[in-house]
Amino acid sequence: MPTLLGIHGTVTSPGRLHHAVQMAVDAASASNLEITTNLLHLGDHQISFADGRPAEAYADDTAKVLEQVTSADMYIIATPIFRASFTGALKNLLDHIPVEGLMGKACGLIGMGATDHHYLTVDTQLRPVLAWFGVHLVPGQVYLQSQHFQDGKLVDAKAIGGLQELGRAVVALNAATGSCTSGPAPLASG
């Protein structure tokens, strides 16, 4: 059975963004009952700073988290936007992952920021990093703001619809591409 991993790309306590990525993961699961889903919250794990060691050389949760990430078949990655970029915690996780760990896998993206000024951050910061890994990316993204929520719950119909469509699109993209890579491996992986 294929596995979809939702990644809550921050160490802050689960809240609105966690709720949103769970909604997208649930929609993916509902679109194909044969997939297994999991949600990884980076704040639940002690992940060392990437320093070039092999994963098994770390004494904390690093190797376990890397195994969970690289063994998944598809992803929905959510990140808050801080200072016009995705989180350092997510960047650190990506720094640990070998290219072949993500290559040829489907992925959808969710960003959340305080204002609409940071909407393009996911496209200009995170998308190029994942493209370098050879990830098959759903063309659009979901961008959320505080006004989409009320009492911590997502209430904006357009945002809810976008998350549901993103979940379904990741499953469809995974089915369409299988394990097909999107081109040659990056120079650094050779």
Which sequence ranges carry the predicted segments?
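N-terminal beta1-alpha1-beta2 submodule of the flavodoxin-like/Rossmannoid cofactor-binding fold
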Residues: 1-95, 161, 168-171, 179-190
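Short acidic capping loops at alpha-helix termini that bridge into adjacent secondary structure
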Residues: 35, 104-105
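Short, glycine-/small-residue-rich phosphate/pyrophosphate-handling segment
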Residues: 107-145, 161
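Polytopic transmembrane helical bundles with strong interfacial aromatic enrichment
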Residues: 152-153
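Short, conserved loop/helix-junction motifs that constitute active-site signature segments
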Residues: 99-103
